[in-house]
A protein has these predicted regions:
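Immediate post-signal peptide segment of exported/extracytoplasmic ligand-binding proteins
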Residues: 23-36, 56-64, 137
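Short, low-complexity disordered leader/linker segments with a strong preference
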Residues: 1-31
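Extracytoplasmic "Venus flytrap"
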Residues: 33-49, 70-74
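Stable alpha-helical elements in mature extracytoplasmic
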Residues: 44-51, 75-79, 120, 128, ...
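Alpha-to-beta junction loops
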Residues: 61-63, 79-93
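Contiguous mixed-secondary-structure segments that line small-molecule binding/active-site clefts
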Residues: 53, 84, 94-150
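Short, polar/charged alpha-helical segment
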Residues: 41-66, 126
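Short beta-strand-to-loop elements that line the ligand-binding cleft
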Residues: 65-74, 145
Length: 150
């Protein structure tokens, strides 16, 4: 069963590629930069803020996620390219942008692909979903999870 927090918001949270090469160290604290294109009022941004707060709390301050919303670091495509070169640690992008790096993700553009919401989550939590998350690894990107787009 998928937790409610994993079902939040839009698109795919992607690309934990090169996390530690995109970290900077401030004293004992490692910092991961997370960029995205959404406004700070968007539910996904709020979920990312929640995640960042929990990461810092659970790591006793040894790991911090700095969030750069509203395309501060670039468009979705530019964010993916920053991941590839190690200048960014994490991003959240839509499958429409990501399918340029992993054509397998074009499957999400098919109408009526899933019977209902539960079927969608059952598929995405299966080996099929894992394979889709891994499909961008050849381009130095690593998918973490799927998010609900509505």
């Amino acid at each position: 069963m998928i937790s409610t927090k994993r079902k939040i918001a839009v698109g795919i949270l992607l690309a934990f590629a090169l996390v530690f090469s995109a970290c900077k160290k401030e004293g004992k604290t490692k910092v991961i930069r997370l960029g995205h294109a959404l406004d700070v009022t968007h539910p996904v941004h709020k979920a990312m803020k929640f995640m960042a707060d929990r990461v810092e709390e659970k790591s006793n301050g040894e790991l911090r996620i700095d969030i750069y919303p509203s395309q501060q670091l670039g468009s979705e495509r530019e964010l993916l390219e920053l991941l590839q070169i190690g200048s960014l640690g994490m991003t959240k992008v839509s499958t429409g942008t990501l399918e340029n790096f992993a054509p397998e993700l074009k499957v999400f553009g098919l109408p009526f692909l899933f019977r209902d919401r539960q079927h969608r989550f059952d598929v995405l939590e299966s080996e099929i979903g894992e394979n889709l998350l891994e499909s961008s690894v050849r381009n130095r990107l690593k998918g973490l999870t799927f998010y609900d787009a509505g």
